[in-house]
């Protein structure tokens, strides 16, 4: 029965995220928010909503290692699998400075998380990501969003069409009440789905003798990364290479700054020494992909 609930949970997570993105994007356009902000924030936040739900619920329930493991492998999945599948569908030619900027931020926030984690590990008894660390990450998240808004205002960002091809309705066709209803239904699906996934995965792991870390690093992380995969593949098929890569980068950034930040602010996250290898591996992979992007002409 737990496996059935797990499948239902994943379905609600993915469908909820899809409905959330649709509703939030339409509301943003109706209110006149620039499309670039919709793409870099609403889309990325929407596809990261499953990870957010799973990690926050895990922190509230005390299953902290699921929160960390979920984000680590979700980012690895985004960087390797989602980017890999996307480039198979369409070769990505990186021309815009915005993408390189966001990739630099992606690398920096990953290193920041490693530094915060190493600091707690070196403290001996304080072997966790503290609430203060979480607040620092949340401040970084807010700063990133503010920077995006300011960069649009001063004309630094040129990706004005970043999300128009991903099923955004035109302003005249937007029904604000219908969009709000979509937003509510989407959030409900994400929350309920996240609860089902955490409870089912934890029960299955316990019955099979698996650790919480292993669960977070496998089935939960990959399942909650499916919205990123679907969104980027759709973008690649439609020829929107900047959207495809931008969604991956934005999701990775919010996974660390928002999800780990909020999760640790709710409850300090216990950090196993074994997770340091996962952190380092993620940074190495990110740097390698980053070098490939920066040398791309």
Predicted region positions:
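Hydrophobic alpha-helical segments, chiefly the membrane-spanning helices
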Residues: 1-297
């Amino acid at each position: 029965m737990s496996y059935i609930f797990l499948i239902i949970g994943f379905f609600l997570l993915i469908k909820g995220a899809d409905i959330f993105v649709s509703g939030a994007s339409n509301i943003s356009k109706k209110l006149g928010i620039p499309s670039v902000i919709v793409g870099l924030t609403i889309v990325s936040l929407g596809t990261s909503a499953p990870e957010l739900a799973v990690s926050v619920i895990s922190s509230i329930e005390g299953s902290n290692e699921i929160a960390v493991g979920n984000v680590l492998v979700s980012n690895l999945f985004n960087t390797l699998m989602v980017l890999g599948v996307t480039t198979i569908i369409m070769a990505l030619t990186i021309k815009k400075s915005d993408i390189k900027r966001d990739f630099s931020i992606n690398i920096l926030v990953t290193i920041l998380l490693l530094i915060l984690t190493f600091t707690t590990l070196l403290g001996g008894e304080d072997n966790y990501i503290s609430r203060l660390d979480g607040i620092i990450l949340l401040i970084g998240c807010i700063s990133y969003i503010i920077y995006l808004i300011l960069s649009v205002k001063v004309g630094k960002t040129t990706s004005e069409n970043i999300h128009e091809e991903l099923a955004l309705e035109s302003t005249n066709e937007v029904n604000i009440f219908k969009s709000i209803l979509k937003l509510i239904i989407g959030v409900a699906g994400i929350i309920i789905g996240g609860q089902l996934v955490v409870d089912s995965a934890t029960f299955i792991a316990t019955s099979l003798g698996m650790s919480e870390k292993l669960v977070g690093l496998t089935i939960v992380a990959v399942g909650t990364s499916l919205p990123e995969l679907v969104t980027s593949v759709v973008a690649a098929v439609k020829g929107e290479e900047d959207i495809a890569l931008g969604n991956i980068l934005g999701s990775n950034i919010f996974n660390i700054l928002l999800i780990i930040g909020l999760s640790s602010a709710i409850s300090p996250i216990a950090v196993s020494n074994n997770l340091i290898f996962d952190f380092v591996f993620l940074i190495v992979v990110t740097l390698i992909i980053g070098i490939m992007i920066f040398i791309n002409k």
